[in-house]
């Protein structure tokens, strides 16, 4: 399945993510901040596990769900020390006019379907984008933000903004509706030789419809 279902649409979290970056910038004047999304992990041969971005990356960009393997957010301090210039480095999609269309199983649209391009990510996030190949080598070696930045982000994430609070409320409502669907399936559950899996499939399917996935695997 392709990952482009929200291509080109402005992210509802965009304004809140910009405020988070502004607050973080004020905490670390003159400091370069690097927040990678993380990479895909191989499950078997050319099959990868479902991608989940690093929480700090998702928090600062407003991108959640499965966006975007290999991406790196860089907040470069301005020369006067007042604020940061932010760039989101991404792997561009390999369309039909690119040899990677067939040869790259991770970026080729022949394999993974339509994906957002750089401009579409700019629309979604409000952040200037650039190809990942343009990311300076020294920055590329940074695996994660510094401990001080991670600590600050952890504390920021503990206090939820309006967008996050509404997302939590929506998740609660969706969870209740999911359990109601399970109750509707109970007659089938007791008759089926794998009734527990009927429950699992019902609830997990609802979670995928209304959100991204179940919040906890256990």
What is each residue range found by the language model?
Residues 11, 180-194:
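C-terminal helix-coil-helix/basic helical segment that borders enzyme active sites and/or dimer interfaces
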Residues 176-183, 200, 204:
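Active-site environment of non-heme Fe oxygenases that use a 2-His-1-carboxylate facial triad
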